[in-house]
């Protein structure tokens, strides 16, 4: 039976025999004494294993197999380490190289690699300290998301990945089809989708919200957590074509309830990471973003300020700062606008509400002024928007009018209108992108490094 390195380091039994499996990170020698660092991914720190060629009968052939990247199983005595920077090491009795790695061609050597280089080998970059730390933080966030909602009476539901609806009304969707397109066709006007697999146009889902609302109208509080897809041709550090979304929907919740839930969830997740991923967070603080932990503590310890979009624009317009896009009423807030508000004005997270309806989704509840909607964005320092949501339109006639106003296909949304025809109620929800949260929590600057195998425009490894 073998043990994980994490278990050995956290519960050491000195002078006991241990067996571990893992991968060789580094190898060095001092005469007849060899030192290899083994890591199995269970923790940031590996453990040093010592080979004494004089005390043990190891063949030269076997020793040559001990190269960086090779997988190994070893048994030895756990002892206190005389070396600095580590408490324990293993004196090897026996070892077996399970999978060899050619040291000349293995791309991960004992040096710091650029993120650009590592993006070219996403299948191997997880073996670095940085991506191991990111993966463990992402895992913990995912677990804590479920924990939070289950503790608070929410039901987890699975919404479709293939859909006939454009949940955002933006039209930036990936089409799903089994039709054979023999020739490049820039127009879909001549295609009869009745011959397609589903008998109609089908797409990869951009959101689970609409289907989630249906279940909220019976279970009261639900959440979805799954992959979503956007065919948005954005080559930025904040956008990906495939990403994971957390989307709660709550019956009987008004906009202020929605904001309170979003704030509470965000603080719960960040607190959990600082408490339970301290080793990885210390590493990320030292090597990725100085001040990372203080940044997260500021979010946890702050009361989120709530301001209207109109007030935000007034603040931006009165500023002497040169923004890339000049702020004025009617445009969506840009990242530099959001960062200015959170970093220089309020110096903490804020919730911006009551956005103009002209650039918001059709399902958002319209305010009495008929110009703005009950939308809300949670903005945090250094990144800007991290959560977006709204109170949903629960009035059938108003929702029908809004759908027609935006020239959306009302027949495709007839089932969605049924939710207003039969037992409608005020309800709210929001979306939190997992990758953007991981990006913020770990301090990495590019969203491509927050997901194992990123999908972005003109980028589809494997």
UniProtKB/Swiss-Prot annotation:
Alphabetical list of InterPro entries matching this protein: Aa-tRNA-synt_II (IPR004364), aa-tRNA-synth_II (IPR006195), aa-tRNA-synth_II/BPL/LPL (IPR045864), Asn-tRNA-ligase (IPR004522), Asp/Asn-tRNA-synth_IIb (IPR002312), NA-bd_OB-fold (IPR012340), NA-bd_OB_tRNA (IPR004365)
UniProt keyword terms in alphabetical order: Aminoacyl-tRNA synthetase, ATP-binding, Cytoplasm, Ligase, Nucleotide-binding, Protein biosynthesis
NCBIfam families on file: asnS, PRK03932.1
The protein, known as: Asparagine--tRNA ligase
Catalytic activity: tRNA(Asn) + L-asparagine + ATP = L-asparaginyl-tRNA(Asn) + AMP + diphosphate + H(+)
GO cellular component, one term: cytoplasm
Pfam assignment, any one: tRNA-synt_2
Protein family according to the UniProt entry: Belongs to the class-II aminoacyl-tRNA synthetase family.
EC class name: ligase
